[in-house]
Swiss-Prot record:
The lineage of its organism: Bacteria, Pseudomonadati, Pseudomonadota, Gammaproteobacteria, Enterobacterales. NCBIfam families: PRK00977.1-1, PRK00977.1-4, xseB. One of its GO terms (biological process) is DNA catabolic process. The keyword Nuclease applies. This is Exodeoxyribonuclease 7 small subunit.
Amino acid sequence: MPKKTEQPVSFESSLNELEKIVTRLESGELPLDDALNEFEHGIQLARQGQQKLQQAEQRVQILLSDDPDAPLSPFTPDNDTL
């Protein structure tokens, strides 16, 4: 059976979910396994958010550039950024 493809989540939704994860982790009430799972999900959300911000910054720079024909190119984040 094929996996469901996830719908793209907005930056704001990801940030909201990340804030909830941080609150749960800071409470100190999660069992270790749950805390590790939450942490892993939080890292994924943070990386996705950083990628979206970098893509938005690239678009703004192109829009503000003097070259009206400057192409948008796909962004590939470095794994060392977080």
